Amino acid sequence: GLENRIEYNLVDVVEGNCRLKQAMITDKRCPYLYLLPTAQTRDKSAISPEQMIKLVDEIKADPENYDYILLDCPAGIEQGFQNAIVAADRALVVTTPEVSAIRDADRIVGLLDANGLKDREDLIVNRIRMDMVNRGEMMSIADVNDILQLNVIGAVPDDENIVVATNKGQPLVGDSSMAGQAYMNICHRILGEDVPFLDLNGKGGFFKKLSSLFKGDKKN
């Protein structure tokens, strides 16, 4: 819901057209969260890996204002992907429990390994529908983990509240919905907290067992 407030973007910063803080956008609902938008009308090659590293280092040099830097990586493995991972020290691989998505995620993990992020990757499985899992029509979290062999840090249900929040331009983190709780739990786990997984099955115990199963289970 912040797109109408964009004046400058990431490319403007690296090209020296504005200062970093001029391009940062804040939201009164999340006063400590800053958004640095990318350029929608410029090619991904407008920024080099070296420029991305320099930009991230500039943000890191101000720890009083910035605790974490989240680089939203574009789909695919083109220049935007390379720019994101070159400055990263940890990767959150987000996938859905579909065969094609898992195949793409496995390829991404291989590229992350080759770029120095091996054993610093965590997995978030998105858009889970437990009714389909129970009918054998969708891969379970365990199935996905068997293939990718990463530490599962989040499991997000396929929740219509996500669509509603996106269309309204409203944050879902902290919301009472299942997806909102799942997002908040991911935040806690990134901070190193031991948070049990939500029972997306609604029957108790399923994701609690997964929590102990996946904790520390990383790719060899």
Which residue stretches match the model-derived regions?
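P-loop/Walker-type NTP enzyme "switch/lid" segment
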Residues: 1-64, 164-168, 173
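Electropositive phosphate-/nucleotide-binding environments in soluble metabolic enzymes
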Residues: 4-7, 49, 102, 138, ...
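Conserved phosphate/pyrophosphate-binding and hydrolysis machinery centered on Walker-type P-loop NTPases
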Residues: 49, 74, 81, 172, ...
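Conserved catalytic-core segment of NTP-binding enzymes
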Residues: 51-64, 68-158, 163-164
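C-terminal lobe/tail of nucleotide-utilizing enzymes
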Residues: 114-220
